Amino acid sequence: MLRNRSFEDSVLPEGYIQREDGIHVKTVSGWLDEFCNGEGLCRWVKGNNIPETEIPAWYTHNAKMELELTDTLNEHRDAALRMQFEKDGSLTNTGYCGISVKAGESYSLYLFAKAKEEIGLDVTIQYQGKVLTGNSLLVSGQEYTRYDMKLTAAEDCHEAQLTISCKEGGEVLLGFISLMPDNTYM
């Protein structure tokens, strides 16, 4: 349901070469392909009115985000996301042209995070500022820890977004985030 949940989409695959235009890459086999900062084909980006961002699918408000390429979740991950929240700062994932939720249905979210100082985060699924479901967590500890929560939608929505907000501000390192419906079969 989340796009770029491991924050690696804008990291060029090994052996690929970024062209000067910032859009195309040369693959290891010599083919020229579109990369668009990890968004994929430019026609998909333009056709779906995807706003530009340095880390695909992730947007901030009163916060700074940057890729962390050394302090990752484990040796199988190429990146983590370092967040510096100001007071009332937020981080939003747009999903694949929105996140679809159904009233009364539950969704399992888990994330790996760590923080030098304890930080409170509010996790919500919302549409145009209206919270459809949410929960809170406290992140602490200098090792990645898994945090799990259930989110149950209050109403149907096909264009929701996941937002992680921080009332007090602070820094957190996110290693991976997953959001999946509990009911995956008809």
Language model regions located:
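Extracellular and organelle-lumenal recognition/adhesion modules and their flexible linkers in secreted
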Residues: 1-186
